[in-house]
Regions:
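Residue register of alpha-helical TPR repeats
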Residues: 36-37, 73, 113, 153, ...
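Eukaryotic all-alpha helical interaction scaffolds
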Residues: 62, 82, 102, 122, ...
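A domain-level signal for caspase-like cysteine endopeptidase catalytic cores
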Residues: 135, 456-459, 463, 593-596, ...
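Amphipathic alpha-helical protein-protein interaction segments
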Residues: 332-613, 632-670, 685, 891-924
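Functional beta-strand-loop-alpha-helix junction segments that form "active/interaction loops"
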Residues: 488-495, 557-565, 569, 684-751, ...
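Caspase-like cysteine protease fold
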Residues: 744, 749-753, 758-780, 825-924
Length: 924
């Protein structure tokens, strides 16, 4: 980071000497000469604080002489010196002033320079999205054909932001792009600086061998030179190499690289950069048990970071202090430091506008919440009467699925007293449009893109943000409490008891898996208990065994026996400690970590070894707070006018002739139809060899159409297309059902999705792969989404966020609940399950969770489908209470006439019966 920014500043520092001219206006000659002398002196002063003060004196003289060039250069220089002191608010202020000053001089190249500087400033402040915005604006100003140096700086800046925000895979792509640009520019020093940054990014990706190779090559180059900049470059190489060795527990090697650096950084860079290296050295002392020495280093670093307003580093070092005190059993001190760290962390998270940044950030900082919960529970063990188990539960809620919580807020329309409802809806719509464009910008960074693409997105974003500011301003005028009303808060135990488990038949089980210990909270309407579970590693190992056996698509008696044994062992781990508490009819499960991959309905009851589904209705939720938000959103919706919108049996190149030639071709195609609704993520999803017809989806949709009745949308064949999906008004429908192939990429969830028609009626290729980003962009405020495809309930497991995948995407799009699968589901078995599920919902009037349980019990009692592989894979996430509200059909004149005729006939029959009874009694 030091060299990335200093490299930019070094290239700018000569601008004063090279461009400032002698003025002919005699009235201002003396003033300008004094200003020039002071400004020249500021460049000679090594102390950045002193240099900034001298430059401010020069700035005052330039302003009095109305010297626009001197003013612009002074603003720029002062901003640079504040950055060198890690004074980010001041650096931002002066860089913005410099940007305006260069704009007044119509100097496009210098404007690009300042935008790049501002990108680095925002990155250091932790406002990564603003950093990307500045880099994007700079890219829009430069000539891509000629200015490879500037392109390299921009790509390097985006790499820095990606690395800092927890997206090193994006950082690697951008670093490689920057290195290529510097190579084209034939700038050897910058080329090797970027080689160093690639080494650092490889370290973040835990590719330690590749990291050391790149860092050593860069170090060899810098040590071959003999100048001040090269010494700093070499020092940063040593810093990164020290981090690599520390990560591999090679502490002696790490210290060899790290110990000489702080003194050099204090002389040549900044106290903040020196403090960061010292904090890393402190971690080595902590690992070696020298806790007092480590604590002293952390305390000194914390003061530096707080003074520099470096929130990211400050939160990290306070966490380190809390962790250290926790290891010494100083629980009060540990709680204080950890609480401070989490408060700063929450402030940073609140400023993140991107779900990708928020999710990545959550994964990076999850251990802070884990340590805090562990600390509270250790205190609870010592004094159970304090009620710290409640505080620990609320910390667990704070730690999980926060990016989804923020996104759900974006989909909700709040009723604010005194505010125009149309204005509220306009603000909500603009906020979601901004979110969509932001995600598109971040996603674009991860691949090859053209300047025009980023330019268009940035222009649109600027317009949307300006519109949003105006609307928010009006809302604030109408209600000063608007800012507080629109914020999301996590649920307390009392709120959970009042609005989530409000009856005696419901219990919430919230799991938290930790390195030192795991916990489960069992919350009923009038009670809360917490139970200690084995460590995360122990649970993870057993989960892997159970999941592999459950997802086996060819179960037999031997695999079923091994599955039963492993499932009993897992049940003993995660349910055994609370077996006596499982006396409710409904269990809401908030899973954590590997437990997200297990259908709890299959786990055996610790009391009698029967699957939980035999006795309990199982509901899943990302968190209790999100379940409450989903419920609130659903309550605000008007009644639906239609029941079902279903998409399935799409057209692929491989089954095109089937749809053109009719039923006979369909019968032939059925013989080569795959058994599972899954596409291998390594394959090309538009390749005919990987996208084959699923014969049972056609039968499934026919059955659903019969059950749902007239007025439903059943989009099959060529109608099962992207265009129909994106243009359907889902607010009219209660259920969205998708029956097709699913595609899962657990490492890159944005590449997961499902397939609709890949060709049109003329056999022209079309975009039929619906990605997770497409799902996020949908407006889908339905009561229920059913993803009748393979592994649609899975995604990337990110600590603190859970599974990032299609289920999350549809909840953001507006769905109150989602039914999805955890493994490659069998085509025929899924069709059968869906038949019973929909009959239970729409004909028997059961709520979705109850209907799913009944359908799964029906299948498991059928000898053909009794293996859990066939029935246990589907789970329900989200709202569970209410049945699907069927629309009341409008009564036509003809139907009213029939009803009157029938009613009249019944009335005559009733009167005749009364008369006959009276006559019989009289006759008797």
């Amino acid at each position: 980071m030091i060299v990335a920014f200093c490299a930019l500043c070094a290239s700018l520092a000569l601008s004063f000497v090279n461009s400032h001219t002698t003025w002919a206006n005699s009235d201002n000659d003396d003033v300008r000469k004094q200003a020039d002398d002071l400004f020249t002196l500021s460049h000679q002063q090594r102390d950045p604080a002193l240099a900034a003060e001298t430059a401010k004196q020069a700035l005052t003289l330039y302003q009095s002489a109305n010297d626009s060039l001197g003013i612009a250069q002074a603003y720029e220089f002062i901003g640079d010196k504040y950055y060198a002191q890690s004074m980010m608010p001041e650096a931002s202020q002066y860089c913005e002033l410099a940007l305006q000053a260069w704009g007044q001089r119509s100097d496009v190249e210098k404007q690009a320079d300042m935008l790049i500087m501002l990108g680095y400033v925002e990155g250091r402040k932790g406002d990564w999205l603003n950093g990307i915005s500045y880099f994007t604006q700079a890219q829009n100003l430069i000539d891509e054909q000629n200015d490879f140096m500037q392109l390299g700086r921009i790509a390097a800046g985006m790499a820095y932001v990606s690395n800092e925000s927890g997206l090193p895979q994006n950082g690697l792509i951008q670093s490689q792009r920057a290195m290529e640009d510097y190579g084209r520019a034939k700038h050897v020093r910058f080329y090797h600086r970027q080689m160093m940054m690639i080494g650092y990014t490889q370290f973040l990706l835990e590719n330690y061998s590749a990291a050391l190779t790149n860092l050593q090559q860069a170090l060899d180059h810098f040590e071959s030179l003999d100048d001040g900049d090269s010494k700093l470059d070499a020092a940063q190489c040593h810093e990164y190499m020290g981090q690599v060795y520390f990560a591999q527990d090679q502490y002696d090697l790490a210290l060899q690289h790290l110990q000489p650096i702080p003194a050099l950084y204090e002389r040549e860079a900044s106290e903040r950069d020196a403090a960061q290296v010292r904090a890393l050295i402190g971690q080595i002392y902590e690992r070696r048990g020298a806790l007092d020495r480590a604590r002293a280093i952390y305390l000194d670093a914390s003061k530096v970071f707080a003074q520099a307003d470096d929130r990211v580093a400050d939160a990290s070092v306070r966490f380190a202090l809390g962790r250290l005190e926790l290891s010494r059993n100083h629980y009060d001190a540990a709680e204080s430091y950890l609480k401070e760290s989490i408060k700063i962390t929450e402030d940073i998270r609140h400023d993140l506008k991107s779900r990708l940044f928020a999710a990545a950030f959550s994964a990076n900082v999850h251990e802070r919440y884990e340590a805090y919960i562990y600390c509270l529970m250790r205190k609870h063990d010592r004094n159970p009467a304090q009620g710290l188990e409640r505080q620990a539960f609320e910390a667990s809620e704070l730690a999980r699925a926060r990016s989804l919580a923020e996104l759900l807020r974006d989909t909700q329309t709040k009723v604010i007293d005194g505010a125009d409802p149309n204005l509220i809806e306009q603000e909500r719509t603009l906020r979601k449009e901004i979110q969509i464009k932001v995600e598109q910008t971040v996603a674009l960074m991860a691949g090859d893109y053209k300047k025009d693409q980023l330019n268009d997105l940035e222009t649109t974003l600027t317009q949307l943000r300006e519109q949003h500011k105006l609307v928010v301003g009006e809302l604030q005028k109408q209600n000063p409490r608007y800012d507080q009303i629109k914020e999301t808060s996590t649920y307390s135990v009392q709120q959970v008891q009042e609005s989530i488990v409000e009856d005696d038949q419901t219990m919430l089980l919230e799991y938290f898996l930790g390195k030192n210990a795991s916990y489960v909270w069992a919350i009923k309407r009038n009670d809360i208990k917490v139970f200690k579970l084995p460590k995360a590693d122990e649970i993870d190992g057993k989960v892997r065994v159970v999941y592999d056996l459950l997802s086996n698509d060819k179960p037999d008696s031997d695999s079923d026996a091994r599955l039963n044994k492993a499932s009993r062992e897992l049940s003993k781990m995660v349910l055994g400690p609370l077996a006596g508490q499982l006396n409710a009819g409904r269990l809401i499960v908030v899973a954590d970590g590997a437990l997200n991959y297990i259908p709890f309905q299959w786990l055996p009851n610790p009391d009698d070894r029967t699957p939980l589904v035999a006795k309990y209705e199982i509901v899943n939720a990302p968190s209790a707070s999100i379940l409450g938000q989903l419920r609130q959103e659903k309550q605000q919706r008007p009644a639906k006018s239609k029941v079902l919108a279903a998409f399935g049996d799409p057209v692929f190149p491989s089954n095109y002739e089937q749809f053109k030639n009719g039923a006979r071709a369909e019968m032939v195609a059925s013989n080569r139809s795959p058994n599972s609704r899954n596409i291998d993520v390594k394959a090309d999803v538009t390749d005919p060899s990987t996208a084959q017809s699923l014969i049972y989806t056609k039968f499934e949709l026919k059955k659903l159409s019969d059950i749902a009745g007239p007025g439903s949308l059943i989009a099959t064949g060529f109608n099962a297309s992207r265009s129909v999906l994106e243009t359907t008004e889902f607010s009219n429908y209660a259920i969205l059902h998708i029956a097709t192939h699913g595609v899962l990429d657990p490492e890159n969830p944005e590449k997961s999705g499902f397939l609709l028609s890949l060709v049109d009626p003329a056999k022209n290729p079309q975009k039929g792969f619906i990605t997770m980003q497409d799902v996020y962009d949908l407006k889908c405020p339905v009561d229920l989404v059913v993803l009748s495809a393979c592994r649609t309930g899975l995604g990337k497991d990110m600590r603190g966020e859970g599974l990032i995948g299609l289920t999350r995407g549809f909840m953001h799009a507006g769905a109150s609940s989602v039914v999805a699968s955890l493994w490659k589901v069998d085509d025929e078995a899924t069709s059968e399950l869906m038949k019973y599920f929909y009959a239970n919902m729409l004909q028997q009037g059961m709520p979705p969770a109850k209907a799913l349980r009944a359908a799964q019990n029906t299948l498991r009692q059928n000898s053909q489908w009794q293996s859990p592989h066939f029935w246990a894979g589907f789970t329900l996430q989200g709202e569970f209470r209410e049945p699907i509200r069927l629309p009341v059909p409008a009564q036509t004149g003809a139907s009213l006439a029939v009803q009157r005729a029938v009613g009249g006939g019944l009335l005559l029959t009733l009167l005749a019966g009364i008369a006959w009874g009276y006559w019989r009694r009289s006759w008797s």
